[in-house]
Amino acid sequence: MQKKVLFNDIVFVCFPITDNGSIIISDIGYSDDGYNRPTGRQGTIENGDPYRITVPAGYSYTNKNVQNGNMIRLVRVNDSKNGCWYNGSGDGWLEIRDYVGPDWRADWTVQIINPANNDNSLYYGQHFRLMNRAQVENPTFQGPSDFASIALWGSNNTNNSVMMLLNGPLDTAKLECCKDNPIFTQPDYCANYRGTTCSGQCDDILSNYCAQVTTTDPKCGCLLPASFYTQNSAIGPPECIDDRCVDTNSYRKSTQCHPNCQIVDCDININDFNGTNINKIVYEQECGSKSTPNGPNGPTPTPSNGPNGPTPVPGIPPANGSSTSFFSRYGLWIIIAIILLIVIISAVGIYFYLR
């Protein structure tokens, strides 16, 4: 959803669907009669000449946003004399006039072409025309020129009189371009300031933006502050392992566009682990792009005595491993041999006693 246009907003003025393509008002031309004239050409926000939307002298509106039928003035931002659009000298071209007081020729009525249902507000990117209050004149783009580009030749309902506003000032416009705001990219007023081109122009812009809004913008999944990735940072970068970034349409820095992810994703549930001869095997789990150093040495586990004797600890052989193994294999035969030996000795003793 695009933002509403408010009085006192700084904007870029565009003619998006002219016979010459998408046009942005970019400068002023100088004439012999002493009055400057707005000029426009195909270009980007970096070429744009920003304007401020103001309430005309003698008017007041309770609503802060510009609405269909409101009177506005377009005042050049980079003009110490507050030059504004003016229906002036009669030669048929839109002028810039300085320090204009109450004057109908400087006042323009907003005519939204397709207003939304039950909403008369003007939105950024929405198409509209302007009508001069003093005369029936629609500003109409005639062609790129160093002298004048915007004609006032009466009423005009062609594509050349269709206008559109983009959010300013320039830093705001760059951010909207980097966020791939469609009113900036269709048609293209952004050039290299596109978040999807990975040109590098948007790296700092998007990083600073995501540091401020964090997860309130779900498309910041690749560019969140480092504290949001502490659990996984030892395994790999977010563009390789974080589900807020991988396989999403999130904003990315140029270094994240074609990541080299050599990550082994290990997930072992010890409760479901079915092992045998655990005390005779060393298990080593390594997750990440490379082996990680062993953790700090902790206390050596010791056997605990259970009802059936000492409980072996995995990885540590029993203290008397050899004797335990010996008796577990030959204990029964040793006992039988001892019994037989006792019987034989007893029999021999009885024999000699009876003699």
From Swiss-Prot:
Organism: Acanthamoeba polyphaga mimivirus
Cellular localization per UniProt: Host membrane; Virion
Protein name, UniProt field: Uncharacterized protein L65
Predominant subcellular localization, coarse grouping: host cell
InterPro entries: Pox_virus_G9/A16
Membrane topology category: Single-pass type I membrane protein
GO cellular component: host cell membrane; membrane; virion component
KW Cytoplasm (keyword) present: no
Glycosylation sites: 20, 78, 87, 156, 159, 274, 320
